[in-house]
Amino acid sequence: MRHRMKRHKLGRYGSHRRSLLRNLSREIVEHGSIVTTTAKAKALKTFMDKLVSKAIEAATTEDRARSVHLRRQINAVLGDRRLTNKLVDEIAKNYVGRRGGYVRVLRIGFRRGDAAEMSLVQLVEASSQEG
């Protein structure tokens, strides 16, 4: 049975959707924030939260084999060792005490050409994790 299997399909077939999310996640790791449609932003938020959680575990675990395994899983998604190292060594260090909510989606209005709702997707700053 397929109970509770809801996911953001984005009007694309599976491999295209995975490719889209991988590309968007690469951009957010590289630049820190991106502007995209709200539907893509919501799908990207859950995708990136899982990726950052893996990065935090890879950065904090004492088990070397587990850390290498997690880095390889992250690299399989990002496809670039430089971005993998940036995510694990720089970005994940800011979120060690945090239990989720690493990505923020802010609605910024509508696109001029087709009136699609646009959103700003950004990594939450480390200073705002207090509280």
From Swiss-Prot:
Q: Which Gene3D superfamilies match?
A: Ribosomal protein L17 (3.90.1030.10)
Biological process according to GO: translation
Q: Which UniProt keywords apply?
A: Ribonucleoprotein, Ribosomal protein
Q: Which GO terms describe its molecular function?
A: structural constituent of ribosome
Per its UniProt record, what InterPro entries does this chain match?
Ribosomal_bL17, Ribosomal_bL17_sf
Q: Which residue ranges run through the membrane?
A: none
GO cellular component terms attached to this protein's record: cytosolic large ribosomal subunit
Q: Which PANTHER family match?
A: LARGE RIBOSOMAL SUBUNIT PROTEIN BL17M, RIBOSOMAL PROTEIN L17
Q: How does it assemble?
A: Part of the 50S ribosomal subunit. Contacts protein L32.
Family note:
Belongs to the bacterial ribosomal protein bL17 family.
Q: Per its UniProt record, what HAMAP family does this chain match?
A: Ribosomal_bL17
Tell me the protein's name.
Answer: Large ribosomal subunit protein bL17
**The species this protein was found in:** Thermotoga neapolitana (strain ATCC 49049 / DSM 4359 / NBRC 107923 / NS-E)
